[in-house]
Regions:
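Long, charge-rich, low-complexity alpha-helical segments
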Residues: 31-90
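Acidic, low-complexity/disordered tracts enriched in E/D and polar residues
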Residues: 1-44, 89-90
Length: 90
């Protein structure tokens, strides 16, 4: 299961989405992670707790012309870009 770490929130600023550390996390993670609407779509699933497979399925459903290999690659890259804000639970 992939989920957002406690203390990370998403805020929309103009046309961009920012993942921001709050509370104690703000003391150790002083950056802002910028993403787009697709990233926000994934983030909302991650906030609730999801699996990699569910992210892939949701992406392919949302973007009908997206093939599985590309979805897997894109989601892997997205998860790497937001790695400070997520955790994997077995």
């Amino acid at each position: 299961m992939i989920r957002a770490k406690q203390g990370f929130i998403m805020q929309k600023m103009l046309n961009d989405y920012m993942i921001i550390a709050t509370g104690e996390n703000a003391d150790t993670f002083r950056s802002i992670i910028q993403t787009n609407e697709t990233g926000a779509f994934y983030w909302h699933m991650i906030e609730k707790g999801t699996t990699f497979g569910n992210l892939v399925s949701a992406a392919m459903e949302r973007y009908e012309d997206l093939d599985e290999a590309t979805a897997r690659q894109d989601i892997t890259e997205f998860l790497e870009s937001i790695s400070p804000a997520v955790e994997t639970i077995q």
